[in-house]
């Protein structure tokens, strides 16, 4: 649900990581646009921060707000390893993993909230 400040309202339970899961995610500015790869323990909260430009940096500068891919793991070390691995991939491989799992490049954030 969008509020009048162009942000998104979230219920409190969505803001906290209750399952002890970790997420590796890819954001895009648009289909085949600029990509951002990150890791977090709370995907809903983190994407909310990206969408509302709460986080200073690359994603804010290049308007990268669309969640197009994510993976889960129960181990922070493996999440960080996977994030580093994806960041080393060439662009073609990154686009292929998105296309394979989300061929329409839908914003997956709205399925999470």
Residue positions per predicted region:
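GIY-YIG nuclease catalytic motif and its immediate N-terminal context
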Residues: 1-56, 60-72, 77-84, 97, ...
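A common structural junction motif
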Residues: 89-90
């Amino acid at each position: 649900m969008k509020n009048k400040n162009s942000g998104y309202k979230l219920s409190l339970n969505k803001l906290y990581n209750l399952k002890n899961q970790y997420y590796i995610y890819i954001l895009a500015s648009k289909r085949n646009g600029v990509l951002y790869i990150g890791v977090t323990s709370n995907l809903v909260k983190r994407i909310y921060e990206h969408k509302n430009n709460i986080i200073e940096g690359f994603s804010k500068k290049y308007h990268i707000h669309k969640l197009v891919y994510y993976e889960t793991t129960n181990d922070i070390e493996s999440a960080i390893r996977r994030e580093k691995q994806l960041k080393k991939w060439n662009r073609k491989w990154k686009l292929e993993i998105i296309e394979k799992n989300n061929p329409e490049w839908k914003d997956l954030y709205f399925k999470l909230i």
